[in-house]
């Protein structure tokens, strides 16, 4: 399974949103590896704890966290990396401030990737397989009416891009049993060419002069309150409030045409999570976990077409706006998910652990088309309501310190999102 059948999570906040598609995604690159503390992978259906989209498993990214110290401490880090295979240059700078009552972690990372190059040893015997004989030089303001011969067919032209990632975290211990974490993340890329489309042929010639994803931008602001009352009814718990803003766009133009098509999407995601643990025995060999999640997605999809103005092989501007079919309903869309869950764990003995849980999820999707120039629909609105009750039963056996055997029986589900029911045209 891939894409919207696998759930991506960063610091306890789900990254999957209403427009995650079933094709290949590049959203994971918006979390810089230089800012990661660890990554956890959960295989198989995990819908009881994580909800919809966790059919194929969960990938949970944990970014680096600041820590307090009895004495004032300042730590700085610098990383620089260069790769010859695609002329990669990555630079990362970080600073951690540790004080008695608060701490901060700041990091900025920049990466630049050149065109990919394939190996020249072709032991499989297909001498021409994968080679790129021609490519489009229509990059930036350059205009070329025809395709260009590739001087080195082993280089996949128009595959390079760059991106910047910023991470800012604050940690404030409000009391011995209460902590506050503030998490700010921002990621932005350059235009990202779509190589498969730029290699597509029509009558033996390249079809597209331009086809690229516009700058992919992700902003996250999250606040997490951790409590440790150590009571019989509640040992510990966390409240997480988060806001995300995601911007994507697709731009394309065919050879032999001056018409350039722009499609832009923006998603605002508001979410609230609560996760709590209750010990059922003094030795804590049995505990009960429970929680809730509310997530609301607001989607805006707009599109337009423009005629490029060309002078001496340079694009000097645009004129003659025309209508283009939007990727998603142009009247706006929303996706609401609410859920509650209960999970029970018991250590049967020193080597065996039993785990079982149940989750109830309700999802609601609404969308509306306004402009029906290209589409004539029997209904101009979509209203979908789904609910699901999922169960899980797991058993863990540890025969030795170095071995662990896991078994699980679980039901999973995935509620259709806007990409499933409201997308028009290409992926």
Please identify what each model-predicted range represents.
Residues 1-14:
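Extracytoplasmic beta-strand/coil segments of soluble accessory domains associated
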Residues 8-9, 25-29, 41, 54-77, ...:
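N-terminal periplasmic accessory domains that precede
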Residues 14-45:
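Short acidic/polar hinge/loop motifs at secondary-structure boundaries
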Residues 41-42, 74-77, 125, 148-154, ...:
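Extracytoplasmic loops and strand-loop junctions of Gram-negative outer membrane beta-barrel proteins
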Residues 86-112, 123-190, 217-219, 282-283, ...:
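Transmembrane beta-barrel wall of Gram-negative outer-membrane proteins
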Residues 121-130, 136, 187, 196-207, ...:
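Flexible, surface-exposed loop regions and adjacent strand-edge segments
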Residues 173-187, 215-372, 387-388, 392-404, ...:
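Face-selective signature of the C-terminal outer-membrane beta-barrel domain
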